[in-house]
Each structure stands twice: as C-alpha cells, then as structure tokens.
Amino acid sequence: MRVGLVCPYSFARPGGVQNHVLGLGGWLKEQGHDVSIIAPGQASRSLLAETGLVPSEFVSAGRAVPVTFNGSVARINFGVGPALKVKKWLDQGNFDVVHLHEPIAPTICLLALYLTDRPVTATFHTATPELTAIRFANRVLPRMVSRIDAAIAVSSEAADVAHHYSGVNPVVIGNGIHLADYPLVRATSRWRGGEHPLITFLGRYDEPRKGFEVLTAALPLVRATYPDLEVVVIGSGTARSVEGVRFLGGLDDEERNAWLGRSDIYIAPQTGRESFGIVLLEAMACGAPVVAANLRAFLDVLTDDEGLVGHTFRVGNSASASRAMLRSLSEPRDLRLERGRALAANYDWSVIGPQVVAMYTVAGQNYATSRGIKNRELKGH
C-alpha cells in the first residue's frame, strides 16, 4: 500500500503529533508499505532515522511560520505556495490512501483534503481548539468534511471535539509508542534512583498549561516530609532558577528514559488542552509511578480494569498535588509497576498500527461507496 502522511507541524520542534506521524510512518514501512510524509519545514536525517525512515520519504511543504495554537507555538504553513507543493506531492505519490493529521486547523492538511482525489483518513488530535480555529472550521469544514472517508481521534475527548465542530464520528485509536524503546526499571531499594526520592517533570515549563507553577507551589509541603527530595525538569524554556530544582534542558530519548526509569514520581501537572497522555504511558513503560492532574485525557490512559494506575489531583490545585505526591511516595515503589507496563503495552505500535491500517480499509470502502465506483483495492493489505 502507498500511504501519504500529512503532518501540519514542522519537525524542527518536537511534539506529540509529529512524533505520532514519524512513529506511524516507521511502523508502516516495517510492514512493507510505501510511505511518504509531507510537513512544513525540514526533517533531519537523524530524526527520520530514529523510526527507520530516510530523507527520500520526506517532502517539505515550504517554510514553517510560528503561530500560537492550543496554548503552544506551532510551526505551520498555508497558502498558495504550500498548496502547489502539496499538489505536486499528491500527483507524484499516487497514494492508495492519504492520512491527514489535525485537519481542524488551517494548515496543509486542509489543502491536501481539498486537493486529493484519493481515499482520505483523518486523525483528530485536538481536544480544545482555539476559538479562531473553531470559527475557521465552522466556515470551512462543513463544506469539506464529506471528503473524509474515515475518521480517527486519539482520545474520547478529541472525538467529542471533532464531532461537535465537524460532524464526524471518529473511532478512538490512541497514539503509539515503541515499547521496546522504554527499558523497564525495577526498584532495588526504598527509592528507585538512589538514596533520595526523585520527582521528574517533563515538558516546556514556560508554557502555563504545562503546570510547572502548580508543581513548584506544591513542593514545600512534600519537602516537609521528605527534606532530601530531588526534583529535575527535562525540557526547553528560558533560563531560570528555582530552589531545590535542577533544570536539565532538552535530552535525547535515551537520557530522558533513563531519568524516567529512576524516578519515584513522574509528575504531570498540566492545566488543560491535553488530548492524550503519551508521556504518562512512557513513564509507566519505564516503571515510574505517575501522579497527574485529573484531566480527562490523562484519566483515559491511567485507567485499567482495576481502576487508576497512579494518583491524581484536582487540576491547578497545588495543595491537592502535594497530597497526591505524598500518597505516592508513601507506597512501595513498584506497587503498580506491572499494571503500568501493561497499560503502556496496549499502545505499542504492534497494537495501534493494525488498527490504523484497518481504518485505511474503511476509507477505501467508503470512498468507493460515496463516489459510486468499484471499490479501490488497497495494495499490500
């Protein structure tokens, strides 16, 4: 099967959608499918190689422009120039299916949706779109949504947003991970990483929605019980100093996973606009206990048949966060380790990938039905 993946965001800055597209592309290639990715900006050879892709499998849609979207700075492009590049990519690709990611915002995904004449699968990632994007979607998507032959959402919340603003009824298929990339670390003493308890925060701490200020406000109460508490922050942001907190900056995946593996708590204090808790899964895959804000997207990935695999607290409430961290630290370190690893395994690409490919088949069938033509066979499936 020839699959065209359309990513709306530049790969110059890491993000959940970009990582998902790369992971999916790499998995599809492993299964013998032909893959091509188009996105704004450039993708480095080393970044592509992390998922088994090569530069010839990436096409640039032109220069990326930073805009504020969903509480973050997204690097996208849109307009005549990108449209011409997308049209050329579609014509040369001769794809069996075109897979758009985040089609609710004005990006190259909408251009591809308008320009393609092939079966279309669309994945909705956004749980809380910006007002401007909603207005745009209300004007444009109703006229174009019929071009989507199969719809996916990464979470139940993202599915609700997609249905409300575009009328589609997506199938929920979460983001994928390569479980083997996350070595499971078991506790060998009271604390997972050494002589002191360790709490790890991961993300762009300058963005208010990441909840770093909630964490710092919660720490004094935790330190009252654990004065030797160690706190590390992994992620980008302006240089700053917070007493008792180490800022490690951006780390490669191997280093980041090593820190997660030795963490006594992975803390996720985000205040909103999270559609999927991918980092919670990554932390659990490494064996780290999770303490998270009770966002709907986080509860979805933290829940198994027995209940919550971790501790949660009220969104934005530092006192509640303190109590949740204290409860977690009082427990045996590996109390929920096996359950967490099992939850993460549910999102391995060996599980997620076939679900996505099944939606490609649905797209082909719906494409044929809606256009009144003989069903287009998806080669290689």
Swiss-Prot record:
Q: Which keywords accompany this UniProt record? A: Cell membrane, Glycosyltransferase, Lipid biosynthesis, Lipid metabolism, Magnesium, Membrane, Phospholipid biosynthesis, Phospholipid metabolism, Transferase
Q: Which domain of life is it from?
A: Bacteria
> Which pathway or pathways does this protein act in?
Phospholipid metabolism; phosphatidylinositol metabolism
Instruction: List locations, semicolon-separated.
Output: Cell membrane
Needed co-factor(s): Mg(2+)
Physiological role: Involved in the biosynthesis of phosphatidyl-myo-inositol mannosides (PIM) which are early precursors in the biosynthesis of lipomannans (LM) and lipoarabinomannans (LAM). Catalyzes the addition of a mannosyl residue from GDP-D-mannose (GDP-Man) to the position 2 of the carrier lipid phosphatidyl-myo-inositol (PI) to generate a phosphatidyl-myo-inositol bearing an alpha-1,2-linked mannose residue (PIM1).
Q: What is this protein called?
A: Phosphatidyl-myo-inositol mannosyltransferase
Its taxonomic placement starts with: Bacteria, Bacillati, Actinomycetota, Actinomycetes, Propionibacteriales
